[in-house]
């Protein structure tokens, strides 16, 4: 079996932890959302299940009719992902939901079809209308509580908190300049400003005593004589002091005790007082009690309502229902598990499951938050304000959650419709069933809208496997509920200490989205609350253990974390008493006895793509950013070649991107061709794994996807072995470019400004040749005037032009086409004009058809040429118009299909029986198995499984069996479930194929009779103007292709393949490219591949040693000779091997010329841009240049006949045809537009004709 090449490394020992599955973010999230493969009763209250349980039951307004949700059921995809791409349809499954309706006539249950729901492919993508798309994870502000501070204009620091729910109204409390706390709801500062004390009362704390008891500890102090006055003067009363007989109030709760008041109270005979410990008249609570205009629960409620809804009558019922709706109704206010977790953690409440399930606000939350805010104001050291850019306060919404939120809004729309229909239904004439009142439109349209229009559902970047992988691991702060790129400040975009090991500090786009779109670090995971975690090794008693702990950013704050590169002895103890470590985001030299954790790997800091840059530690961050981004733009080449200098991540990146085919199980290769690999399983050779290879498919970005087998018949393979290479991979490793012999030197000025000089030898060897595939589509429709027809019989077209078309009017495969060639001939009916009688007679005699149809053929657009690689035709079959022969042929096909279906079903049954036998035969039953519906006991507890019992289980459906959870039965459930899924899939495939034989392509759009897709492949060689780059941000444009004989050569006669400008290195500070050059030269000479992982790569000394070992110059510089003159250059030059990439900015796609073309309707000036066949804009500054030279005639024709002088254009055409040399320009159309605009403003502007 073929294995990846072993790479030489200087790393002392391998990482303790392997990288997690790199697309797990996507797959895990969507799996949790749909819970595919779980029985209805096993489903947890998350994802789609949670949404249905939230919205249902729905009751009619009079509560006589109730619609309950029972369970949902997902079908099997009708087509495979590849077939969906081919047909241009969505890869989805049907969603059926079982409801129970209870009304006056009784109880009815029904399964209702709720439309289709897109499902994820194994690679973590969706196929929507035939295009692969990715849903990007969104980083947003976490629900919960945040404490903040801001400086007032008078210099005071004002503290505030904000309770942010997952859904619902924001609650904000702010200190003002007078130390009073005001509550704002939904950030409406002026209109909804409510004193916090009023709000507390409205929550149900009606008396002042209740409120004081909540905020202070209360002590009872004796008052027997005037001696006790000293201890009591200045203290604050915690309760009213009332005369028992006369009910007179001598002291109110919250009042400060004075000597006179104490005397009055002593005279009444009161012997003890309740005192608020720690309260004084300056305490915010005491101040607010004095300021509060209300004194009871009812008054506070009304005041709250009045401020919230000024102008509306404040009744008690209205006020109570408003506050309930705002914060205590789970349908309108939801903190979510995350919000509750964050709030409880901050305020010190318990974090058990029961508490975390309380999603609405509680009174205790508001009191707790106000207490914390007051402690913060008082300067309590145990309190702190929150940093909103810290990753403890930002969380990730992955695919599942984003779609769940959209489903919720769709079902909420449906809820209104259901209520309306329940009310309007006429029970006298018909019986009500769930199917009659449920409309699936709401859910379907919301999902369709999300996948096709949402900012977070993006067309997948498929330029190469790395681009694909990165797209799935991308994090965006934009999108609905996120930030706005115009308003986002510097702080949000900046790298934060908490990003370490979670978000890559390097990989982000240049331009307006910098810092808003980021990438997950290589080891990062997302936990159940949506916070990003990173792994650390646990350190106990100074010993670094192999135990791994995943930590979120807030937990990490409390730990002292050593670097992964800290040196350990053979007992895993630190070699030195002091090492570099991090604590609360700051790096310092820590005593090793205080270290609690250690990094898992130095590369946990960066993302996968950044981790592919060798010698990253020697590159400036700005250039590393460019290097990361440009690797994603590398075009897959015809001949792939792995990098000599890698980082060790290449194999893993290729595997997780899905570009290569990997063995799922151990086995032996039984059959190999370019389309399929068959592996017989090791445990049971009768069972086969079949791997279909992708051949010359078009990717989203027009590059070519092609897989080639690496194994041979008889090879023994183990799980995870590479069976086939894909695009931009070489022997299972990522291979984005070529290893090229470069020299850093100027050469006749051709490499000025980062330009690149390449040898013609690279072109001859097809080193940088790539294949591009263009797709052209044409549809024939049924129009009002008649049917369009795909045919070879096109009016007014010569036979020469039709040479490459087949009899059916479609170009033959293998034909070479160039711009303007016909790919598919099509004629469209023209609207019939009134004909003269003699014309009608002639038409009748000669039967001229050409007059009533027009040519609407598909032609090759400008700038495209290549070979027709594939043609796909989709058409509907009309049942009535089939001939007898066709019907006979159809029957034969159907018979063959049925035979194939039966044989496959029999094979499945045999495999299923074998699996059950292997698990159960002669084993003892750990628990009874009961039939749900009949309640029959199929297997007694303790019984021995025999063949008969196994056959009995084999016939039953998993849904009908009650199986107790245990190890053996869990495996049994998996076997039964996978068998049922396989049978279901086989049945769907059979029905789909049968339907296709009978109906043709029934899923074509309405009105389409036939659809033809033509694929044209073109080979693009490297040419002048193409953009190339290394992995260190060293980019440039090919300026000259030099004959091999003229290139500089080494003393041994070997010519250099590429020349780079040495001035591109010092100012850019990307020295990684120089080290790569030296190490690449040494490794190439030694015939080995090396890996230099980021931050733990080859030291310089080791590179020099390798150079000397291989007999290369120890300074890495060689004397070169000029290929043109044969003379030696004066100075020594750095020569070595660099891995250079060809980027997808090819000159062939950008070069453009126009002779004639379309004009803008309003201004009558030529359109702009290549896509519109536009012209080059000759703008104001260009006009100045011509004016400076005084070229009057050229100026005149540029501003008139070459632009928007409509009559002049026609005249100049005529004069060119006649061979005259005459320019008579008229009025430019833009002048008329100006006049019309002024007239539109009501100005009477008319050009005056003055006689000369």
Curated annotation (Swiss-Prot):
Disulphide bond pairs: none
Gene Ontology biological process terms, A to Z = DNA-templated transcription
UniProt-listed Gene3D superfamilies: 2.40.50.100, 2.40.50.150, 3.90.1100.10, DNA-directed RNA polymerase, subunit 2, domain 6 (2.40.270.10), RNA polymerase alpha subunit dimerisation domain (3.90.1800.10), RNA polymerase Rpb2, domain 2 (3.90.1110.10)
> What's one Pfam family here?
RNA_pol_Rpb2_3
EC number per UniProt: 2.7.7.6
> Which NCBIfam families has this protein been placed in?
PRK00405.1, rpoB
Q: Please describe what this protein does.
A: DNA-dependent RNA polymerase catalyzes the transcription of DNA into RNA using the four ribonucleoside triphosphates as substrates.
HAMAP family per UniProt: RNApol_bact_RpoB (MF_01321)
Q: Which named protein is this?
A: DNA-directed RNA polymerase subunit beta
Please tell me the species this chain comes from: Chlamydia trachomatis serovar L2 (strain ATCC VR-902B / DSM 19102 / 434/Bu)
């Amino acid at each position: 079996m073929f294995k990846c090449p072993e790479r030489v490394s200087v790393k002392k020992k391998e990482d303790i932890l392997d990288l997690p599955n790199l697309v797990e973010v996507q797959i895990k999230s969507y799996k949790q959302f749909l819970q595919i493969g779980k029985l209805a009763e096993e489903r947890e209250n998350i994802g789609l299940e949670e949404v249905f349980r939230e919205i249902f039951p729905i009751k009619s307004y009079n509560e006589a009719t109730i619609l309950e949700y029972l369970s949902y059921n997902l079908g099997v995809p009708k087509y495979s992902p590849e077939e969906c791409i081919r047909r241009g349809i969505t890869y989805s499954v049907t969603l059926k939901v079982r409801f129970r309706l209870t009304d006056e006539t009784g109880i009815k249950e029904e399964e209702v079809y709720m439309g289709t729901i897109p499902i994820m492919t194994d690679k973590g993508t969706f196929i929507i209308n035939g295009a692969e798309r990715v849903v990007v994870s969104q980083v947003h502000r976490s629900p919960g509580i945040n404490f903040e501070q801001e400086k007032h204009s008078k210099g005071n620091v004002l503290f505030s908190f904000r309770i942010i729910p997952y859904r619902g109204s924001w609650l904000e409390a702010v200190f003002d300049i007078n130390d009073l706390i005001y509550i704002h709801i939904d950030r409406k500062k002026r209109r909804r400003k409510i004193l916090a004390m009023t709000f507390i009362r409205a929550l149900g704390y009606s008396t002042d005593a209740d409120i004081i008891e909540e905020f202070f500890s209360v002590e009872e102090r004796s008052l027997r004589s005037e001696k006790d006055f000293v201890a009591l003067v200045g203290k604050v009363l915690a309760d009213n002091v009332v005369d028992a007989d006369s009910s007179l109030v001598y002291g109110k709760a919250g009042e400060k005790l004075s000597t006179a008041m104490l005397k009055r109270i002593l005279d009444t005979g009161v012997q003890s007082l309740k005192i608020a410990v720690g309260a004084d008249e300056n305490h915010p609570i005491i101040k607010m009690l004095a300021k509060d205009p209300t004194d009871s629960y009812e008054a506070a409620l009304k005041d709250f309502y009045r401020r919230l809804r000024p102008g509306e009558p404040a009744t008690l019922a209205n006020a109570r229902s408003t506050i309930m709706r705002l914060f205590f109704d789970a349908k309108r206010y939801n903190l979510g598990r995350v919000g509750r977790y964050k709030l409880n953690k901050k305020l010190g409440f318990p974090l058990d499951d029961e508490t975390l399930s309380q999603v609405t606000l509680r009174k205790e939350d508001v009191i707790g938050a106000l207490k914390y805010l007051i402690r913060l104001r008082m300067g309590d050291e145990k309190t702190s304000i929150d940093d909103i850019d810290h990753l403890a306060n930002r969380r990730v919404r992955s695919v599942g959650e984003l779609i769940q939120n959209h489903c919720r809004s769709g079902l909420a729309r449906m809820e209104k419709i259901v209520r309306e229909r329940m009310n309007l239904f006429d029970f006298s004439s018909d019986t009500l069933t769930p199917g009659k009142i449920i409309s699936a439109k709401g859910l379907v349209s919301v999902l369709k809208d999300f996948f096709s229009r949402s900012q977070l559902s993006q067309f997948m970047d498929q330029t190469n496997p790395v681009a694909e992988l990165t797209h799935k691991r991308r994090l965006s702060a934009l999108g609905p509920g996120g930030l706005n790129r115009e308003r986002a400040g510097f702080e949000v975009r900046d790298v934060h200490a908490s990003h370490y090991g979670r978000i890559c500090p390097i990989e982000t786009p240049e331009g307006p989205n910098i810092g808003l779109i980021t990438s997950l670090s290589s080891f990062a995971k997302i936990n159940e609350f949506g916070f990003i975690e990173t792994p650390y090794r646990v350190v106990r008693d100074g010993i670094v253990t192999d135990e791994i702990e995943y930590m979120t950013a807030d937990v990490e704050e409390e730990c002292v974390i050593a670097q992964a590169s800290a040196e350990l002895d053979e007992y895993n103890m630190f070699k030195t008493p002091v090492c570099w470590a991090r604590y609360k985001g700051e790096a310092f030299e820590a005593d090793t006895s205080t270290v609690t954790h250690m990094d898992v790997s130095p590369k946990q800091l960066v993302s996968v793509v950044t981790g592919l840059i060798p010698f990253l530690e020697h590159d400036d961050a700005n250039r590393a950013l460019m290097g990361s981004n440009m690797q994603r733009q590398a075009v897959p080449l015809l001949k792939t070649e792995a990098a000599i200098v890698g980082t060790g991540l290449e194999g893993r990146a290729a595997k997780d991107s899905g570009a290569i085919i990997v063995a799922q199980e151990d086995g032996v290769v039984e059959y190999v061709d370019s389309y399929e690999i068959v592996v017989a399983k090791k445990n049971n050779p009768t069972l086969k794994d079949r791997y279909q290879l992708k051949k010359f498919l078009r990717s989203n970005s027009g590059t070519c996807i092609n897989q080639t087998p690496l194994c041979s018949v008889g090879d023994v393979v183990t799980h995870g072995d590479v069976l086939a290479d894909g695009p931009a991979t070489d022997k299972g490793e990522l291979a984005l470019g070529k290893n090229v012999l470069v020299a850093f030197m100027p050469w006749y000025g051709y490499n000025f400004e980062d330009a690149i000089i390449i040898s013609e030898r690279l072109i001859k060897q097809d080193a940088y040749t790539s294949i591009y595939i263009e797709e052209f589509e044409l549809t024939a429709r049924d129009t009002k005037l008649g049917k369009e027809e795909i045919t070879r019989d096109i009016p007014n077209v010569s036979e020469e032009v039709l040479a490459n078309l087949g009899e059916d009017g479609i170009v033959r495969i293998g034909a070479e086409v160039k711009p303007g060639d016909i790919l598919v001939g099509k004629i469209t009916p023209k609207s019939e004009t009134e004909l003269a009688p003699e014309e009608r007679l002639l038409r009748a005699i000669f039967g001229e058809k050409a007059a009533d149809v027009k040519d609407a053929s598909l032609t090759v657009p400008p700038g495209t040429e290549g070979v027709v690689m594939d043609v796909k035709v989709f058409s509907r079959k009309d049942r009535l118009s089939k001939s007898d022969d066709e019907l006979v042929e159809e029957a034969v096909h159907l018979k063959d299909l049925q035979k194939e279906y039966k044989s496959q079903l029999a094979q499945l049954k045999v495999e299923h029986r074998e699996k059950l036998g292997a698990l159960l035969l002669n084993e003892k039953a750990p628990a009874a198995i009961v039939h749900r519906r009949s309640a029959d006991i199929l297997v007694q507890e303790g019984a021995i499984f025999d063949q008969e019992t196994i056959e009995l289980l084999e016939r039953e459906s998993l849904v009908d069996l009650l199986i107790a959870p245990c190890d053996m039965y869990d495996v049994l459930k998996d076997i039964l479930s996978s068998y049922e899924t396989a049978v279901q899939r086989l049945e769907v495939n059979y029905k789909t194929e049968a339907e296709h034989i009978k109906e043709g392509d029934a899923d074509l759009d309405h009105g389409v009779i036939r659809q033809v897709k033509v694929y044209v492949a073109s080979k693009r060689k490297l040419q002048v103007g193409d953009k190339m780059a290394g992995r260190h941000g060293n980019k440039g444009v090919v300026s000259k292709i030099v004959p091999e004989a003229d290139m500089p050569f080494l003393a041994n006669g070997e010519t250099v393949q590429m020349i780079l400008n040495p001035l591109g290195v010092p100012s850019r500070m990307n020295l990684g490219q120089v080290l790569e050059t030296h190490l690449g030269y040494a490794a190439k000479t030694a015939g080995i591949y090396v890996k230099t992982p980021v931050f733990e790569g080859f030291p310089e000394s080791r590179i020099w040693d390798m150079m000397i070992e291989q007999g290369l110059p120890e300074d890495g510089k060689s004397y070169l000779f000029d290929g043109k003159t044969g003379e030696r250059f004066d100075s020594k030059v750095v020569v070595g091997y660099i891995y250079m990439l060809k980027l997808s900015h090819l000159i062939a796609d950008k070069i453009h010329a126009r002779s004639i073309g379309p004009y803008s309707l309003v201004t009558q000036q030529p359109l702009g841009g290549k896509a519109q066949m536009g012209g080059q804009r000759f703008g104001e500054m260009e006009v100045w240049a011509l004016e400076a030279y005084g070229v009057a005639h050229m100026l005149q024709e540029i501003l008139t006949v070459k632009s928007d002088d409509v009559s002049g254009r026609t005249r100049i055409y005529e004069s060119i045809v006649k061979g005259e040399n005459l320019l008579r320009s008229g009025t430019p159309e833009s002048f008329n537009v100006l006049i019309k605009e002024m007239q539109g403003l009501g100005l009477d502007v008319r050009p005056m004709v003055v006689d000369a």
